[in-house]
């Protein structure tokens, strides 16, 4: 997710938005109205396709609304600061147009296989754009190969692993049991093809989205007093030098790029605008107008990022679990019982430095700093990546042989050890080993701030549903990519079985 990829993803969306005269923005709400209308749920006479326009979008959303909406948002706000949410919104605003274009093209250039099923996606659009010449064929094959590989990785193993870990940590059910049940459920559904997947998605996706949105709104309004400060942090840190994970402020350009990188990256991971995957499911829609279906499918980016991801982001920001100044200083920490190594340096009368490595461990009666002989020491600690909160202390890095300097004073702040764990120094000289809460755990802490332990269960259930729907959606994407390469029905049936079995290994 470097500058080149950011320019390609966001830049393409910006170009198309201006090129289309902001049509996608102006037609967003009419498109949402059309999406939720009765007409979008039926297959009209005169068109062709496998499923209704609504079912096609729900199948596409099944693959896009996943762990990124819960884990990805939290990770972006930790790594890129709260301001990463702003860049998610910006990328989604222009990603709407990208999604419109790729889905409309997919329907325009779709074909019908021997079984009367629709086949579409970027591989077909690319071939048409190059007039079926060799460069287009090569690019189309490459896209299909990468989509097929992604179906097993991001669309299968990653999601299955998230489900089994969540079920094990919350309900203490062995991972192999979860894997077995999940494998059987996926196999039963995907063997029915697009009809079965779309029927399940049409019920599961709206239900799980409403479930999560309602729970998130309860958390947000339960922390209503924290909303102003949370919003302030989100917008200020999107353009400030205090949004780098670890809490160290850098140059404005560097930290903005970091916030932008994580915001755009996690946003695309969540809504898949520009990746082309949603266009594969869009091609199955029963319609005679590719522009109309393009408008309907672009609503997926709005619902995924502007709605669901925003719920997660505001729940985290308003609850205060992320912190009020930066992502690592005042965040939510948990005690880490593992030993950590720090370097201590004694300033004597001759201003000499003692560079002995000590181990600091938690004890039953509190905390202690001991040397390698087991003696309690009073040396002033110095570790990597100093963060001072109240007093100015002159520390340089000492780890890895870099000279350290110190002034004798009471310390208050947060440092990191060799492994990157946070070490917090309090005013009374106590030392605590603290690990920053990240990912799904951070979202759980946000929900727990209002709903208690029930909040943890709700996030876990949401994570399970989101990940399960992603598996179903990506099975269809991978199958159609394989059909483009192999063009034999038997291969697709074999893929369905193999895909389902791979779920167990996740």
What are these model-derived regions, one by one?
Residues 324-355, 359-360, 396-400, 409, ...:
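N-terminal glycine/threonine-rich, aromatic-flanked beta-hairpin/loop signature
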Residues 384-414:
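N-terminal helix-cap/turn-to-beta initiation motif at the start of protein domains
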Residues 102-110, 215-235, 244-251, 285, ...:
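Extracellular/periplasmic helix-exit of transmembrane alpha-helices
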Residues 16-17, 91-116, 127-161, 165-189, ...:
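Helix-loop-helix module between adjacent transmembrane segments
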Residues 6-11, 137-145, 169-194, 210-211, ...:
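Transmembrane alpha-helical segments of multi-pass small-molecule transport proteins
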Residues 1-63, 67, 77-84, 95:
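N-terminal alpha-helical transmembrane segments of multi-pass membrane transport
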Residues 42-77, 105-129, 145-148, 249-302:
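Alpha-helical membrane segments and immediately flanking helix-loop junctions
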């Amino acid at each position: 997710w470097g500058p080149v990829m950011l320019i390609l993803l966001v830049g393409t969306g910006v170009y198309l938005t201006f090129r289309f005269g902001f049509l996608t923005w102006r037609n967003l709400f009419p498109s949402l109205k059309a999406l939720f209308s009765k007409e979008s749920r039926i297959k009209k006479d005169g068109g062709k396709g496998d499923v209704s326009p609504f079912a096609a979008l729900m199948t596409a959303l099944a693959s896009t609304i996943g762990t990124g909406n819960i884990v990805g948002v939290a990770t972006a706000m930790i790594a890129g600061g709260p301001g990463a949410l702003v860049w998610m919104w910006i990328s989604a605003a222009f990603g709407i147009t990208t999604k419109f274009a790729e889905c409309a093209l997919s329907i325009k250039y779709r074909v019908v296989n021997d079984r009367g099923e629709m086949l579409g996606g970027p591989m077909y659009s690319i071939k048409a754009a190059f007039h079926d010449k060799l460069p287009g064929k090569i690019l189309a094959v490459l896209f299909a190969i990468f989509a097929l590989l992604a179906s097993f990785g991001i669309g299968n193993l990653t999601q299955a692993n998230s489900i089994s870990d969540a079920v094990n940590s919350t309900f203490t059910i062995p991972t192999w049991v979860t894997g077995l049940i999940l494998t059987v459920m996926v196999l039963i559904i995907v063997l029915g093809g697009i009809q079965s997947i779309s029927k399940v998605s049409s019920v599961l996706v709206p239900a799980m989205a409403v479930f999560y949105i309602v729970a998130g709104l309860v958390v947000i309004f339960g922390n209503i007093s924290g909303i102003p400060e949370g919003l302030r942090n989100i917008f200020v840190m999107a353009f400030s030098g205090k949004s780098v994970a670890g809490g160290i402020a850098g140059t404005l350009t560097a930290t903005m790029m970091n916030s932008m990188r994580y915001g755009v990256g996690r946003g695309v991971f969540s809504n898949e605008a520009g990746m082309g995957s949603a266009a594969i499911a869009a091609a199955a829609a029963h319609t005679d107008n590719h522009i109309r279906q393009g408008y309907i499918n672009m609503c997926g980016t709005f619902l995924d990022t502007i709605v669901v991801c925003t719920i997660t982001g505001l729940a985290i920001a308003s609850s205060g679990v992320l912190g009020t100044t930066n992502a690592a200083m005042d965040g939510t920490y948990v005690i880490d019982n593992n030993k950590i190594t720090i370097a201590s340096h004694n300033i004597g009368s001759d201003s000499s430095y003692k560079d002995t490595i000590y181990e600091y461990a938690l004890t039953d009666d509190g905390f202690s700093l001991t040397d390698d002989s087991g003696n309690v020491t009073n040396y002033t600690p110095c570790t990597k990546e100093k963060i001072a909160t109240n007093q100015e202390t002159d520390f340089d890095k000492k780890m890895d042989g870099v000279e350290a300097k110190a002034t004798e004073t009471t310390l208050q702040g947060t440092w990191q050890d060799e492994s990157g764990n946070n070490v917090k120094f309090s005013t009374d000289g106590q030392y605590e080993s603290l690990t920053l809460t990240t990912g799904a755990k951070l979202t759980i802490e946000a929900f727990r701030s209002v709903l208690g332990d029930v909040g943890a269960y709700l996030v876990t259930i949401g994570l399970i549903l989101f990940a399960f729907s992603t598996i179903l959606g990506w099975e269809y994407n991978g199958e159609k990519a394989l059909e483009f390469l192999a063009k034999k029905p038997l291969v697709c049936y074999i893929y369905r079985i193999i895909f389902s079995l791979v779920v167990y290994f996740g």
